[in-house]
């Protein structure tokens, strides 16, 4: 059966936490100060093919909070998933890997970050929702511009 005639299938096989790290290097002294944090969040999405239509996608969230020049905490979560994508052309597959899969994984990563930060003794941290569609569109635009040069 050719790819054009194959029925499209998008399925989640597994969602799991691949890596978790939480550090509060300046505790307990940091807890005695007025908490005026400066938050920096880094987000990264990686994907790779495992075998015939099966892909592994990882959303990595790193949240670093500083007070003045001291790190209050550093939290990193890698939320991963295994997805089946069958019958899609290359553009559709790239879209699913860059938008739909991260949209599926991010709420789990967001919850894990919030839980780790709270368990670390800090006020709850609720990460803002991420517009993976916009990030993907920006990525495509930058790719198109770099090929023109």
Curated annotation (Swiss-Prot):
GO terms for molecular function: unfolded protein binding. InterPro entries: SecB, SecB-like_sf. Its main location: cytoplasm. The keyword Ribonucleoprotein does not apply. GO terms for biological process: protein folding; protein tetramerization; protein transport. It holds the Pfam family SecB. It is found in: Cytoplasm. GO terms for cellular component: cytoplasm. Keywords: Chaperone, Cytoplasm, Protein transport, Translocation, Transport. One of the proteins required for the normal export of preproteins out of the cell cytoplasm. It is a molecular chaperone that binds to a subset of precursor proteins, maintaining them in a translocation-competent state. It also specifically binds to its receptor SecA. Homotetramer, a dimer of dimers. One homotetramer interacts with 1 SecA dimer. Belongs to the SecB family. This is Protein-export protein SecB.
